Amino acid sequence: MTFSVKAMPFLPSDEPARDSYIKNPMLWADVPDPDVICVDGYFYMVSTTMHFMPGTPIMRSKDLKNWETIGYVYSRLTDSPKYDLQNGTVYGRGQWATSLKYHNGKFYVLFAPNESGAMGDTYIYSADDPAKEWTLVSRMRHFHDASLFFDDDGRVYVVYGTGNMCELKPDLSGVVEGSDMKIFEREADERGLLEGSRMLKHNGRYYLLMISHVWAPGRHRRQVCYRSDNIRGPYEKQVILQSDYGGFPYVGQGTIVDSKDGDWYAVIFQDRGAVGRVPLLMPCRWIDGWPMLGDEDGHVPTWMRPIAKEEKKVSIVSSDDFNEPKLGLYWQWNHNPIDEAWSLTERKGFLRLKTNRVVSNLYEAPNTLTQRMTGPTCSASAFIDFSHLKDGDCAGMAAFNGHSGVLTISKAGKQWQLSMSEQVVSLTDREKSIKEVEQEVKETVQLTQRSVWLRIDGDFRVNQDFATFYYSYDGKEWFRIGTRYKMRFDYRKLFTGTRYALFCYSTKNRGGYVDIDNFEFGDIPQSSIPLVYEQENTGSNYSFPAMPSVSQLPVIRELPDPLTMRFEQKGKVKKGQEGQRITRFADWERRRNEIAAAIQHYGIGVKPAVAKENVKARMVKDTLVVDVTVNGETLTLKSKIQYPKTGRPPYALMIGTSGISLPRKLFDDRPIATMVFSEAQVNDYSQWRKHKERGEYNFDRLYPELKDNGAYSEWAWGLSRLIDGLQLLGEEETKIDCCHIGVTGCSYAGKMALFCGAFDERIALTIAQEPGGGGAAAWRMSHPLDSVENLEKTDYHWFLESMRENFSGDNVYRMPYDHHELVAMVCPRALLLLGNPDYKWLADEAMLPSAIAAREVWARFGIEDRMDYSIVGGHPHCQLPESQYPITQAFIDKFLLGKETEE
């Protein structure tokens, strides 16, 4: 028999309606080992939180979408000093896989800490109201991943381990002697334990849901079901779910639940990397007496119809102003707290954390307060007044796990400082004692006042798991500090998802404290940094610094730091790289102008500015015509605009340098116009056809004093004049949105696109396809490589002849800039670099480190999503492979159309 289920996956057609639908994951947070029941129209869920206190959280929802924590089964566990971080720890242990049941008007939970000895006892608690106090009913021997089951005849059972079962006494005080039995055996191809037992009864049959792993090729983590007409067996087996989802691994372990309307649902968790193990929601359809999970094809659906009308939007995570006399239920302590060492009342509106015990590191520190981090992205910040810390005290905020990224306020001599460090704990296998904490400080800044805002952003999208770290003196202007930290989930360490953690501990003497306020939890703040500008060159606000002679330039063998100012006002280079390092975006304009000056002076020649009154523009049908008059000479540029067949004007625009090499299909279904910049109208140099010589081009009629220029400065100048024309005419006449202009090209035209994007800040998106040496590849990196386009082997019609004279051979290390800084000039706008390693001449070996170094500029300002690179072979030169379609489409959609995607 097939049961009809209303909650089938369904993608609503009208966008606003999506808010009422449930999108998987049901909760993008660490909520492993879920058990769910439905009582009086509410769903109740329990999960594993291990060493965090209070423990065994009870969550409630009316609609399976909005969940809130309504209480905990216990406030602390006291069987061992390990729970107090004394004589060891219980990291990765404590409360595991809990069974939640409702029977005869009472709620019951059963769980067993995954530990040997007394701490391994199984606990059974009960409550009349799950939001209020729970009472310990009994303790008995250890049952691994057990399911409590009340049968219709009044008998009570525990199913545990891999097919083990025993009967409990009616009052749940212990095991009925002689009742232990094996109800099924594991199959030969199944490895490890079958875990996560969930027993239920439906239509007179017994069903046991478990997770299974198999060795066979092509087989994965899966959810299986055993069923029998008799609780003691024999049981038959069926795979009821074998599905991955959303680019993450296969799904398994959880339960099924029926609503008051008779519909059935499954809540099964999925490993999602550093965020932890997250619950997914899916239909459960009874087919031939089996609870089959997922959609009709057996896959986890993205969308589910609403289960019930939502009462209110609630969450298991939250901001907190600490104005209440009790901590919110979204907070948990790492191990048992020391109650006298924290307060919400000693300073009204603040959480006070006091040092109480001298410890060596964060993992030993008591009273670390935590909340789950959430996906796909999240951000949390807090104000910390550290004016009462003592020498040797450490306080701050962490992305806390076995591998942690940590912001620590500490004292160095008489100066307070903030450091960002990466910390990794090593634990003994049995006792979970701390063997070692490896700590690597990535950056330290001196603090200029005795209070600071700290912020950590988390990105848990596919293949991400990154945390970024910030500090602020006013909560408004944020400064990036440290690395973009790769978070990790490691079952051998904490076995939990990464959490936000607030901490304060002492390494010398007790008695110091911090006051914390305004914990703000939400999504990553929308950057206030512009994506595009109306002005061609914001650096025109600054005069170019004087450039030193080549003999004055120091040897710099590594890639120069793109964020460090390099030239003194008098024109002398400071020794090494001892200039001011940019930390604020407000200073980037000045540094970017310095890079532009160096590239023009030593590399390509001057790109001259043009007064608006010297540019005239008109539309001739669909062709843009621009006249530029300088020194009594006029140069005319023409470019036909190809308008899209979809959408409404004004349209985004993609300009192809010498043509558009990207596949036409990337634009056919998008409301994006295209046009081609024919560079020969400015400078007709070509490697493949007859051309004029340097000083004879159309550009040189306007600027005879710049006859030594390289082609890339002149071509960049020409494309900018087309944008001048679009701005002059306006969107009503051109049908073009000048705030969403992109530029792209491949090979030599990929270089051209990169120079155009770098030198015109009105270009929102630059896609440089296979730009090769002289493009994104740093000259320093290509110099030692064989058979690549390096500084000696490039085409010098593109560059100043003096560049070859000045920087050939090992003199390349005297170059005061490199092409990673050309790449960085595109920041804060969007850039995608596409490489092809099959063509060695392109020097992708040099482009990769150049791209990585340049991306640090975007990262410094917290906008690294605006820059990426993809190097993929197996295709002809300048023919984009399908494997690069997704990232290219994502950049086009986001930065030309303003659409966020899963990419």
Segments from the language model and where they lie:
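N-terminal pre-domain segments of enzymes
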Residues: M1-I22, P291-K312, I529-G605, E903
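Carbohydrate-active catalytic/glycan-binding domains of CAZyme proteins
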Residues: M1-L531
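C-terminal catalytic histidine-bearing segment of alpha/beta-hydrolase fold enzymes
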Residues: A382, I852-E903
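Non-catalytic accessory segments flanking enzyme active sites
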Residues: D561, F567-P649, S661
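Cap/lid segment of the alpha/beta-hydrolase catalytic domain
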Residues: G656-E732, C738-C739, G772-G775, W779-M781
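Gly/Ala-rich beta-loop-alpha elbow adjacent to hydrolase catalytic centers
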Residues: G745-A749, A753
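Mobile cap/lid helix-loop segments that gate and shape the active-site cleft of serine hydrolases
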Residues: A768-L822, A843, M847-A851, A859-E864
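Conserved strand-to-loop "acid loop" that flanks and positions the catalytic carboxylate
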Residues: C827-R829, L833-D844
